[in-house]
Amino acid sequence: MGQISFKASRCFAFVKESNAIEGIIRNPTKEELDATEALIANRSMTVEALNSLQEIYAPGMPLRNKLGLDVRIGSYLPPPGSPKIEGDLWNIVGMANSRNFDAWEVHVAFELLHPYMDGNGRVGRALWAWKMINDEANPFELPFLQEFYYQTLSQYSDCEVELLREPFKSWETE
């Protein structure tokens, strides 16, 4: 299986755009770039790799694996913090390592779980890029289009999965 290159310039642009989606308007730090490149370089995904990236993006904002570690994202309430969160994250990692799931399915599952207190968006987009690369698609020619990105994530919980499959499929095959 070949792999699409993740050049430093692409990493810089990707992390800068991912930060901008979160309202972080600055150049990526060396630590963010190194951690993102390390995640993308993995041949298989692990919870540890996601945790390492998240710790760079949002230090001190842990996995929500304890009761009371709850978050709210606009009107969306992810599952409450509990030991179950870590098991659910392992399931998402299993999806990521499987050819039976598309990158968008893994990304949406991650975002709906929202496993960390902070940093979920940027880690989720890095997971999406990793999955695209490992499925031999090219995520770096596909801008996130912030408005479409958030609109689609919010519609996911209100729509049939198949209604969303087609737009994402076209992104992955262009």
Segments predicted by a language model, with ranges:
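FIC/Doc superfamily catalytic core
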Residues: 1-174
